[in-house]
C-alpha cells in the first residue's frame, strides 16, 4: 500500500516537472536589451572649450532680480492649462499603478445570490422535479439562496503582476519628470517672451530718437530750400529716411503686440486681466557651462529623467511578458451558507466551505506569448534607442547653446567698442559745433551713427539674454531628480 502511494507521488512529481520544463521550453530565443549610453560618454567634444560655470539654481529667474518677471512666472505656474494637464497625467499614472497593485492583493467580496428555478423533469436533476416530501423533494420549484464571503489570491511566484506594477510605477515617475519638464518649458518661455518685449521697448525708444534726429534734419533742409540755400535733393533724402524709420517703428509696435498676446496665452490671462509690463533694462547674464556633464546632466534634465523612467518601465514590461510563460497559481475560497429552501438558509447544516487551489500552465497558445514577448522587447529597445538619442541631443543642445552664447558675448564686446567709437565722433562733432566750426545740423546728424550702433548692440544684448535662457533650459533650469516613487 505504501509502495503504491510512493509510486503515485513519484509519478505526479515526474509529470509536474515535465510539465514545468515543457512550459519553459515554449520560450523562444529572446533578443538582448540594447545598450544604454553610459554616463562617462556624456561629454562635449574635445575641441569645444567653453567658459566654466555652475549648474542653474532652482527658481533661476529670481537671480535676474525682476519683480515683473517673478509675478508673470508665478501666475503662469498657478494658472497654466498645460501644467494642469501634466499634473492630471500624474494622477492618471498613479491611479494606473494603484489599480495594478490592487489586482495582486487578496480580494475578498461579500456574495449574496437568490435563484428561483423550476427543475426539468427530463433533465439531469429530474429526481428533484418530483413532489415527494418523504424523500426530501418538494419540486419542481425551488428557491436556492447563497450568502457568504468569497476570497481570491493570485500567488505571483514569477513576478507577472510585480513587474507590471513596477512598470506602472516607472510610468508614474516619468509623469512626475514630465511635469517638471513642462514647468521648465513654461518658465523659460515666459522669460524669453518677456525679455523680447523689453528689447522691443528699447528698440522703439532708439527708433523714436532716430526719428527725432531725422525730423530735425527734414525741417532744416526744408528751411534751406525755402530760402534758396540748397536744392531739394537733401530734403527728399531726409524725408525718405524718416519714412523708413516710421516703417520700422510700426513693425516694432506690431511685434510688441504679438509678443504680448503670446505672453497672454502662455500665462493664461484673459482679455482684460493682462498685467501691464513696464520697460526695464535687459539683465547681464552668465555665459558659462558646468565643467563636466556626465551623470549630472541626466539627473538635471527632466526630459531625460522621464525617458530614463520610460526605459525602466519598458524593461519591467519585458520581465512581465517573460513571466507569463511560467505556471500561475491562485487560491480561491468560499465560506458561507447555501440552501435550496429559504427557511433552512440560516441553519447550521447550511454551512458551506470551498477551498480551490488552482494551477494554470500555457502549453499551446499558437505563439501568442512569444509574439507578445517579441513585441514588448522591440518596444523596449525602441525606447532605449530613443533615450540614447535624447541624451545625445541634450549634449548637443548644451554645446550649441554654450557656443552661441560665447560667440555672442565676443561679438558684444566688439560692438560695444564700435558704439564707443561712434560716440567719440559725435562728441567731436558737438565740440566742433560749439566752436563754430560746423553747423547745428551736422552736429545733430552725428547722432545717427551712434543710434544705429546702439541698435546693433541692443540686438546682441537681446540675443544674449534669450540664448542664456535657452542654455539654462538645456542645463535643466535647476531641476534635480525627485526621490523615487516606490511601491509601498
What positions do the PLM features span?
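Terminal intrinsically disordered/low-complexity segments used for targeting and assembly
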Residues: 2-78, 126-131, 138, 169, ...
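Small/polar, glycine/serine/threonine/aspartate-rich low-complexity segments that form flexible
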Residues: 55-64, 113-150, 273-290, 319, ...
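Transmembrane beta-barrel architecture of outer-membrane proteins
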Residues: 69-71, 144-146, 192, 237, ...
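Membrane-embedded beta-strand positions in outer-membrane beta-barrel channels/transporters
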Residues: 73, 146-150, 194, 239, ...
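Sec/SRP-type N-terminal targeting helices
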Residues: 84-85, 101, 141, 155-183, ...
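Periplasmic alpha-helical coiled-coil/stalk elements that build and connect Gram-negative outer-membrane
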Residues: 177-293, 404, 408, 428-431, ...
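A short glycine-centered flexible hinge/capping loop motif at secondary-structure junctions
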Residues: 225-229, 433-437, 474-478
Amino acid at each position: 500500500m505504501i509502495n503504491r502511494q510512493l509510486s503515485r507521488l513519484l509519478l505526479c512529481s515526474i509529470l509536474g516537472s515535465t510539465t514545468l520544463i515543457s512550459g519553459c521550453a515554449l520560450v523562444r530565443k529572446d533578443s538582448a536589451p540594447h545598450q544604454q549610453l553610459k554616463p562617462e560618454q556624456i561629454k562635449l567634444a574635445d575641441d569645444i572649450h567653453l567658459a566654466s560655470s555652475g549648474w542653474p539654481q532652482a527658481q533661476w529667474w529670481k537671480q535676474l532680480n525682476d519683480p515683473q518677471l517673478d509675478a508673470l512666472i508665478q501666475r503662469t505656474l498657478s494658472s497654466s492649462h498645460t501644467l494642469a494637464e501634466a499634473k492630471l497625467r500624474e494622477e492618471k499614472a498613479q491611479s494606473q499603478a494603484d489599480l495594478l497593485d490592487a489586482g495582486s492583493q487578496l480580494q475578498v467580496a461579500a456574495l449574496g445570490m437568490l435563484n428561483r428555478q423550476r427543475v426539468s423533469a427530463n433533465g439531469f436533476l429530474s429526481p428533484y422535479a418530483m413532489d415527494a416530501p418523504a424523500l426530501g423533494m418538494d419540486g419542481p420549484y425551488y428557491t436556492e439562496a447563497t450568502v457568504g464571503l468569497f476570497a481570491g489570491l493570485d500567488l505571483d511566484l514569477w513576478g507577472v503582476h510585480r513587474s507590471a506594477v513596477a512598470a506602472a510605477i516607472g510610468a508614474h515617475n516619468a509623469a512626475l519628470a514630465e511635469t517638471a519638464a513642462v514647468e521648465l518649458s513654461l518658465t523659460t518661455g515666459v522669460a524669453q517672451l518677456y525679455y523680447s518685449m523689453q528689447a522691443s521697448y528699447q528698440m522703439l525708444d532708439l527708433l523714436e530718437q532716430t526719428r527725432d534726429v531725422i525730423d530735425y534734419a527734414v525741417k532744416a533742409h526744408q528751411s534751406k530750400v525755402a530760402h534758396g540755400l540748397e536744392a531739394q535733393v537733401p530734403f527728399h533724402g531726409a524725408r525718405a529716411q524718416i519714412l523708413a524709420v516710421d516703417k520700422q517703428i510700426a513693425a516694432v509696435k506690431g511685434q510688441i503686440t504679438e509678443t504680448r498676446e503670446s505672453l497672454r496665452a502662455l500665462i493664461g490671462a484673459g482679455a482684460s486681466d493682462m498685467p501691464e509690463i513696464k520697460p526695464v533694462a535687459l539683465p547681464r547674464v552668465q555665459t558659462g557651462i558646468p565643467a563636466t556633464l556626465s551623470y549630472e546632466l541626466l539627473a538635471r534634465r527632466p526630459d531625460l529623467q522621464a525617458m530614463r523612467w520610460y526605459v525602466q518601465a519598458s524593461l519591467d514590461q519585458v520581465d512581465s511578458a517573460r513571466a507569463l510563460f511560467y505556471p500561475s497559481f491562485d487560491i480561491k475560497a468560499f465560506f458561507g451558507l447555501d440552501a435550496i429552501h429559504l427557511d433552512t438558509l440560516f441553519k447550521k447544516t447550511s454551512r458551506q466551505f470551498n477551498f480551490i487551489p488552482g494551477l494554470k500552465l500555457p502549453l499551446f497558445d499558437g505563439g501568442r506569448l512569444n509574439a507578445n514577448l517579441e513585441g514588448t522587447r522591440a518596444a523596449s529597445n525602441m525606447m532605449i534607442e530613443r533615450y540614447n538619442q535624447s541624451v545625445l541631443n541634450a549634449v548637443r543642445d548644451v554645446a550649441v547653446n554654450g557656443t552661441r552664447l560665447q560667440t555672442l558675448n565676443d561679438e558684444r564686446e566688439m560692438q560695444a567698442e564700435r558704439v564707443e567709437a561712434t560716440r567719440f565722433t559725435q562728441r567731436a562733432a558737438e565740440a566742433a559745433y560749439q566752436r563754430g566750426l560746423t553747423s547745428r545740423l551736422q552736429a545733430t546728424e552725428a547722432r545717427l551713427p551712434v543710434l544705429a550702433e546702439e541698435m546693433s548692440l541692443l540686438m546682441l544684448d537681446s540675443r544674449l539674454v534669450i540664448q542664456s535662457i535657452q542654455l539654462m533650459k538645456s542645463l535643466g533650469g535647476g531641476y534635480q531628480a525627485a526621490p523615487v516613487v516606490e511601491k509601498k
